[in-house]
Amino acid sequence: MTTPNGMPDNPGDPENTDPEATSADRAEQAAEEAAARQAEESPSGQALEEEISPELEAEINDLLSDVDPDLDGDGEVSAVETQLAERTEDLQRVTAEYANYRRRTERERQGIIDTARASVVTQLLPLLDDLDLAEQHGDLNEGPLKSLSDKLINILGGLKVESFGEIGEAFDPEIHEAVQDLSQGDVKVLGTVLRKGYRLGDRVIRTAMVLIGDPEES
């Protein structure tokens, strides 16, 4: 116990002078201070924005590794020593749970970001289809429309959005929607692409609409 000025009631007590006896308390105090700072910075129900500092986590682990259940070295573990060992185990468990929680909330936060991006890209699909048709008719060779198309493609590329569905590409029912199968052999490829597909990273936003054909003979 400490007085209001931060000094222990009995500075000479082994509990306050023995490094082994105080290491667990120091570790627990460090963990509590980290948790208090995190609670102030992150409102309830929101994902954590910052991780516990590597220096603090290393300090906690170092302090915990120095704890010996037999503090007085008499070969027997007293009730106080048993309680200290239990508190140390509890702190180790809480530290591991906090690390797992931090990783889980980070995954959830990234999932929310990806969902929002996918929603925006979905709303832009009609515009992308119009630009694709304009390119097929030769309207994107030059002029302001080409400049607009290039800028939009660059922005989407920065968001890891890419199109797929090219003639001759192997048919994949997971990402290609076949309107008609005109192939006669076992090997099926895209004979005609009616509408391009788009993906955001590993997430398919829209499948490609295609006609299946046979591969061209080389």
From Swiss-Prot:
Please cite one Gene Ontology biological process associated with this protein: protein folding
Ranges of biased composition (kind: Basic and acidic residues):
23-40
Q: Where is the composition biased (Acidic residues)?
A: 48-75
Q: Where is this region: Disordered?
A: 1-75
Keyword terms of this UniProt record: Chaperone, Cytoplasm, Stress response
Where in or outside the cell it occurs: the entry states: Cytoplasm
Entry's Gene Ontology molecular function annotations: adenyl-nucleotide exchange factor activity; protein homodimerization activity; protein-folding chaperone binding; unfolded protein binding
| Major subcellular site | cytoplasm
Pfam hit, one = GrpE
The UniProt entry, under Gene3D superfamilies, shows: 3.90.20.20, Head domain of nucleotide exchange factor GrpE
| Organism domain of life | Bacteria
Q: Which Gene Ontology cellular-component terms appear in the entry?
A: cytoplasm
Q: Which PANTHER family match?
A: GRPE PROTEIN, GRPE PROTEIN HOMOLOG, MITOCHONDRIAL
Query: What is the annotated role of this protein in its UniProt record?
Result: Participates actively in the response to hyperosmotic and heat shock by preventing the aggregation of stress-denatured proteins, in association with DnaK and GrpE. It is the nucleotide exchange factor for DnaK and may function as a thermosensor. Unfolded proteins bind initially to DnaJ; upon interaction with the DnaJ-bound protein, DnaK hydrolyzes its bound ATP, resulting in the formation of a stable complex. GrpE releases ADP from DnaK; ATP binding to DnaK triggers the release of the substrate protein, thus completing the reaction cycle.
Question: Which family is annotated?
Answer: Belongs to the GrpE family.
Quaternary context: Homodimer.
User: Under what name is this protein listed?
Assistant: Protein GrpE
Tell me the organism.
Corynebacterium glutamicum (strain R)
Gene behind this chain?
grpE
